[in-house]
A protein has these predicted regions:
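Acidic, low-complexity central loop/insert segments
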Residues: 2-57, 65-66
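Divalent metal-binding acidic/histidine catalytic loops
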Residues: 44-46, 50, 54-307
Length: 307
């Protein structure tokens, strides 16, 4: 059982009260839990989380512990054609998914993309998966670091439009608190967006749903300083921002499903505000498509992930 509180006194009181009800043993501050290594620096006011040990186990399981590292998890210019030959490696995708959900937003796009082929995993996909492992080999020391007193919740959202193979777009969002990401996602959109504006609109809707949940979660924990009255979400598509602020339907927006108009209501009610951020500074960009080394590193650092 992991227990947290706003002060050490409150934590001691909670442990004492619980100990009167059930038998328990206080193991002190967590060092390793559910595959996550936790390091706390009280002097610097930071908490760092990494999965170095788990990464080592995955690399050894697939014979990649001595592989040559690469600087990005997935190559630019994805090959869309399928090659012959099947590989059943669903367990590898599951292992990589656990890393994505834990501390590695930098491999979210690559792993999500590979998971779409889990029923038809070819030699080509196995080669792509091995590249992810080689990337992890070179970045196994990476940790997400949260710093007390830094900025409250901030959201970033992005979308890639019209993937060649399917015509679908991909949504991504990242929410940061205390200088690092606390929740992130990369997912293929369930519709075929007819423009980049529409794809960004769909991505913003998903981000606001996640932001609403996160805001409520912080309020339940009485962490109101990290839960602003109005949550800011950064977006790099000015057309989508204008469409949010203009409730009048036009030829470009009248076909959009009502469920994606949820975000207009959220903005009008003051729960969210959407601000423009140039693409070169968008940290959610690496969760929608392959990135060159410099941009991949920039996005990782923006998520509080340091190698």
């Amino acid at each position: 059982m992991l227990m947290v509180a706003t002060s050490e006194k409150a934590l001691r009181n909670a442990v004492q009260a619980l100990g009167e009800k059930i038998e328990l043993k206080d193991l002190g501050e967590p060092k390793y839990i559910l595959g996550l290594e936790v390091k706390r620096d009280k002097t610097q006011g930071t908490i760092s989380i990494n999965q170095k040990k788990y990464i080592g186990e995955v690399l050894k399981r697939y014979g990649m512990e001595n592989s040559k590292p690469v600087s990005t998890p997935i190559e630019l210019g994805l090959a869309q054609e399928k090659t012959a030959g099947q590989r059943e490696e669903k367990s590898l995708i599951g292992s990589l998914m656990y890393l994505v959900q834990g501390t590695r937003p930098d491999i979210a796009f690559a792993v999500n993309y590979l998971s779409e082929f889990s029923k038809n995993f070819t030699i080509q996909h196995w080669s792509m998966a091995k590249r992810v492992l080689r990337y992890l080999q070179g970045t196994c020391e990476a940790c997400i670091t949260y710093t007390a007193g830094k900025e409250p919740m901030m959201g970033y959202t992005n979308a890639s439009w019209n993937e060649v193979a399917t015509g679908s777009s991909r949504s991504a969002y990242v929410f940061t608190v205390c200088g690092a990401a606390v929740t992130w996602k990369s997912k293929k959109q369930p519709i075929v967006a007819l423009s980049t504006c529409e794809a960004e609109y769909v991505a913003l809707t998903e981000a606001m749903k996640e932001g609403s949940w996160l805001n409520n979660f912080f309020q339940e924990l009485c962490l109101n300083k990290y839960s602003p009255g109005t949550i800011t979400i950064k977006c790099d598509n000015q057309s989508a921002i204008k469409m949010i602020k203009n409730p009048v339907q036009n030829q470009r927006s009248k076909h959009i499903n009502l469920k994606y108009l949820y975000l207009r209501n959220q903005v009008e009610n003051g729960n969210f505000t959407v601000e423009y951020l140039p693409t070169e500074f968008m940290i959610a960009d690496a969760l929608t498509k392959p990135m060159p080394r410099a941009k991949n590193l920039y996005c990782a650092k923006g998520c509080g992930l340091f190698f």
